[in-house]
Regions:
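Glycine-rich beta-strand-centered segment in the early N-terminal region that forms part
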Residues: 23-35, 50-93, 132-134
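Short, hydrophobic beta-strand segments that form beta-sheet elements in well-ordered domains
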Residues: 5-7, 70, 191-197, 211, ...
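Mid-domain Rossmann-like dinucleotide-binding core that forms the NAD(H)/NADP(H) cofactor-binding site
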Residues: 135-216
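Residue-level marker of beta-strand positions
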Residues: 65-67, 82-83, 120, 172, ...
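NAD(P)H dinucleotide-binding glycine-rich loop of Rossmann-like/cofactor-binding domains
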Residues: 90-166
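Short glycine-/small-residue-rich Rossmann-like dinucleotide-binding loops
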Residues: 36, 74, 89, 230-234, ...
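Glycine-rich cofactor phosphate-binding loops and adjacent beta1-alpha1 units
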Residues: 158-165, 186-187, 202-274
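C-terminal hydrophobic helical "lid"/dimerization subdomain
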Residues: 3, 284-341
């Protein structure tokens, strides 16, 4: 069959290409239905990545957050029409120690490999996780981002000491909101503190016990463990603030992505005996746990619906441009594309 793939060939330039695919393989064929734009996609779309990176990664189809319906499954795992979340990480080897999302040989969609802006996506059955029938598809569209926070939480549970009375979350954006929400549900008795720089964003964190502007943190604030969800150059200040306020022997999870190296106060990391770990991307197991959390705590999807800042029907390439340009103006929330190509 001929599959149409909508590739970014240069910043703000998307073209359709044609890819001949066979149905006589072990791949499940999925028709995308709802996709969500990520900051990483925007960096490619706007050309804010380095010229070297763009030359290496483009052309490629963007988007690694999305759901779709199964059209054909030779494995018999999914019935035709089943709504599934697509896992963008594609490992090429197995390792007993290193997780598939940390293997340097793994391929990640919309990062040098075609993402979900296609008529049909071809994936192995183990790259798909069924979506609950009653889940809002606009929320399900960015399940991948939620699974990233779930992955960080799963790693935390293995690394951190068991005194989990107070948590601090730095970052008032989408990832900070999701991470804080998960902590609220998984540790309902713990005190949840959120730190950010924009009051209008902090107002969304109604489930937190306390919210603080990063320039107005009381001297007596403290917490057992912290999660950095800032990214960019701002992650430097967030990490160092966390180091200042965290109780000794606490654990710090770093989730924010920065293009540049940042300076952190290693002296106090040593002095306080802190555990610092990085967390990136996710696995099918994280997607599965995310779906379980959606069903165990129905108010999680309800809260996440507050992140849907705009929904665009995509019927032509110009609609993709409109969605991306609109997303650039959003200070908070996720832009969702209903894929009708």
């Amino acid at each position: 069959m001929i599959n149409q793939v909508y590739q970014l060939v240069a910043p703000r330039q998307i073209e359709v290409t044609y890819d001949e695919r066979s149905l006589n393989t072990d791949r499940v064929v999925v028709r995308p239905t709802y996709l969500s734009i990520c900051h990483a996609d925007q960096r490619y779309f706007t050309g804010s990545r380095s010229a070297e990176v763009l030359a290496k990664k483009l052309p490629m189809a963007m988007i690694h957050e999305g759901i779709g319906k199964v059209v054909h499954d030779p494995s018999g795992t999914f019935k035709k029409g089943t709504l599934v979340a697509m896992v963008p990480n594609t490992p090429t080897e197995e390792d007993d120690i290193i997780g598939e999302n940390y293997l340097r040989t793994s391929r990640f969609r919309s990062s040098g490999y075609d993402g979900y802006m296609q008529d049909y996506v071809f994936l192995k059955a183990d790259r798909l996780v069924e979506v609950p029938a009653d889940l809002d598809p606009e929320v399900a569209a960015f399940t991948e981002l939620v699974s990233v926070a779930v992955h960080a939480l799963t790693r935390f549970e293995k690394i951190a000491h068991p005194r989990r009375e107070t948590f601090g979350v730095w970052g008032d954006g989408n990832l900070g909101f999701i991470t804080a929400l998960l902590l609220r549900k998984v540790y309902p008795e713990a005190k949840l503190l959120v730190f950010g720089k924009t009051q209008s964003k902090l107002d969304y964190f109604s489930f937190a016990d306390e919210t603080y502007h990063i320039d107005q943190i009381p001297a007596d604030v403290s917490f057992n463990h912290g999660f950095e969800c800032v990214g960019g150059i701002g992650s430097q200040y967030a990490i160092n603030q966390m180091i200042d306020y965290i109780i000794p022997e606490g654990t710090m999870a770093l989730l924010g992505v920065s293009e540049d190296a940042v300076a952190i106060n290693t002296r106090m990391i040593l002095e306080k005996g802190l555990r610092v770990y990085g967390s990136s991307r996710s696995t099918p197991a994280d997607f599965a746990r995310t779906m379980e959390l959606y069903q165990t705590y129905p108010d999680i999807p309800a809260y996440l619906s507050n992140l849907v800042s705009g929904v665009f029907q995509i019927r032509q390439i110009e609609d993709i441009h409109k969605a991306f340009e609109n997303d650039l103006t959003n200070r908070f929330g996720k832009t969702v594309m209903e894929w009708c190509m």
